[in-house]
A protein has these predicted regions:
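Glycine-rich, low-complexity intrinsically disordered segments
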Residues: 1-103, 107-130
C-alpha cells in the first residue's frame, strides 16, 4: 500500500480543537494559510488555481489522540450525545483512516502560499492533497 505524506501544513489562529467550526464554511471570517512543503511550493504546482474560487482539502486529524480507533459508532453532539450513529454518517474525527475533507474559499495566492477563508482546520494540520 502506498504511504501518503503531507504536501502542506495549515496555519490558523486556532491552536486547539475547541472553537473549531464543526464544518468548513461556517466561519466565513476565519482566515488560514496553506503552507506547502518546499518541493511543492513552486509556481508550476499552483498554476491555474487563480481561476478557481474554492478548493477541496484532504487532511489528517493529527491532534486526535483518542483510543477510540476502530470504533464504528460514535455519539454526535448534535444529537445530545445520547444516540449512536455509524461513523460514516457523521463528521466525527474518529475515523478508520483519520482523514478529513473540507471545502475552502481561496482569498489569494502569494509566494506559493494559499490564503483561504472558512476552513475548519486547526493550526499545524497536515494537508495530504488539494
Amino acid at each position: 500500500m502506498k504511504e501518503i505524506r503531507p504536501i502542506a501544513f495549515f496555519r490558523s489562529p486556532l491552536t486547539s480543537k475547541f472553537g473549531i467550526p464543526r464544518q468548513s464554511g461556517l466561519a466565513d471570517n476565519l482566515v488560514g494559510k496553506i503552507v506547502f512543503e518546499s518541493q511543492y511550493q513552486r509556481e508550476e504546482a499552483l498554476r491555474g488555481l487563480e481561476d478557481f474560487d474554492y478548493l477541496w482539502l484532504i487532511w489528517g486529524f493529527s491532534a486526535n489522540k483518542s483510543t477510540d480507533e476502530g470504533k464504528l459508532t460514535v455519539r454526535p453532539p448534535r444529537l445530545g450525545g445520547n444516540e449512536r450513529l455509524g461513523v460514516f454518517a457523521t463528521r466525527s474525527p474518529f475515523r478508520p483512516n483519520g482523514l478529513g475533507l473540507s471545502s475552502v474559499r481561496i482569498k489569494r495566492i502569494v509566494d506559493g502560499v494559499i490564503e483561504v477563508v472558512g476552513a475548519d482546520l486547526m493550526d499545524g494540520t497536515p494537508i495530504y492533497d488539494v
